[in-house]
Amino acid sequence: MGSPNLKMMLDTYHMNIEEDSLGEAIVRAGDQLGTFHIGENNRRPPGRGHIPWDEVVAALRAIDYDRDTVMEPIVHMGGGVGNLLAVWRDMTDDRDLDEAAREGLEFYRGKLAAAETGCAGPPASEAKEGHS
């Protein structure tokens, strides 16, 4: 890109569709990664799908990523975003959105902390079981 003011953004939802390896894509981005969007393969908050979070956080750690991370769950029908993205079912599991966001953030922070200490942390399936 050649400009110190121009960076790229990666999004785990889209990476899940397009990349062979999320970790390799993050490492290839390296210091050009300026913003990172986190969300599951099913657009739910982290810990409620099958994104390989241990691989993701290991790659972020490998490139010393310390910039903005944005959680981007899209779980409601209707409204501007729901209509634009054609969300056809409610994916909140009858849960409060603020609580779901907090749980997703706690899950992601736990994965980051585990990567720092060298422990894998709980698998995503455990996070899902606790919140069904």
Residue ranges and their predicted role:
Residues M1-S132:
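Histidine-acidic metal/acid-base catalytic patches
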